[in-house]
A protein has these predicted regions:
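Acidic (Asp/Glu)-rich catalytic clusters
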Residues: 16-24, 41-61, 91-95, 193-200, ...
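Acidic/histidine-rich catalytic cores of soluble enzymes
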Residues: 135-141, 145-240
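Glycine-rich, aromatic-flanked loop segments that form ligand/cofactor-binding clefts
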Residues: 50-61, 94-162
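Glycine-rich anion/phosphate-binding loops
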Residues: 39-45, 75-92, 181-188
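Active-site-proximal loop/turn and secondary-structure-junction residues that shape catalytic pockets
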Residues: 9-11, 34, 66-67, 105-109, ...
């Protein structure tokens, strides 16, 4: 097993010089914060990220994440266009020597927290999710809450360019049940798995965070039963 520290690029408040001093760290898990779901990650951008890490004598172990466009997750008529973009990104990452991609298949909210700077009893800070807070708000208020705590930092999965169309996104998922969402995941994986095998790229799915439905949006990696179903799907797809 290799240990990687997540790093958000040159704008990260934790410089790579500090990351390098963490005992046992083999490298970093990086991202390109300027990329929106559906964008192609270009070779030059990936190489620039990789070189910025390697010049600090660290290794870019993988990417978290290459976000999946909502058209793919909701199964709209545009999904094949964005899957083609995703496939090109897989090829470009592989060409740069990056063979691990983390991803999630959650509608709209890639992750959800109600407090980004919760102070613990020992004075340390952590993320916090409080279901009672969520139950008392409208879905659109979740973005406002996260944005107000971000201190100007661009958060993956909470891109202003995407979430300012929040009501439109909610309509996109109208009628998308857990079964439909899972079928759309299967469609996506069926298209990318042959490319991943050819490019020697491993895909690592992130479980639901939190591990239950929020705002009526379906979740399909929320418990052991879901993950067993997911693993069975992978087995069937790789047998073809």
């Amino acid at each position: 097993m290799k240990w990687g520290f997540r790093w958000y690029g040159e704008g990260d408040s934790i410089p790579l010089q500090n990351v390098r001093q963490i005992p046992g760290i083999n490298g970093v898990i990086g991202t390109l914060l300027n990329k929106l779901p559906g964008d192609i990650w270009e070779l030059a951008e990936i190489e620039e990220l990789k070189q910025s890490i390697e010049k600090e004598e660290l290794t870019l172990l993988g990417i978290e994440s290459v976000a999946i466009h909502d058209a793919i997750k909701a199964g709209t008529e545009e999904r094949d266009h964005y899957i083609d973009h995703y496939i090109q990104t897989i090829k470009n990452l592989s060409a740069c020597g990056i063979h691990l991609i983390c991803y999630s298949f959650k509608p709209i909210f890639g992750w959800a927290k109600t407090n980004l700077f919760y102070e613990n009893e020992d004075g340390s800070f952590s993320l916090l999710y409080d279901q009672a807070v969520v139950e008392g708000m409208e879905p659109s208020e979740m973005y406002t809450l996260i944005h107000s705590q971000s201190k100007g930092f661009k958060l993956p999965g909470w891109e202003e360019e995407r979430l300012k169309k929040f009501n439109q996104l909610m309509e996109t998922y109208d009628g998308v049940t857990e079964e439909v969402l899972f079928d759309n995941l299967a469609y996506f994986l069926k298209r990318i798995i042959p490319v991943c095998e050819e490019m020697n790229v491993k895909m690592a799915i992130h479980p639901d965070d939190p591990p239950w439905e929020i705002f009526g949006l379906p979740r399909i990696t929320k418990n052991l039963s879901d993950l067993k179903k997911y693993c069975l799907l992978l087995t069937l797809l790789t047998m073809d």
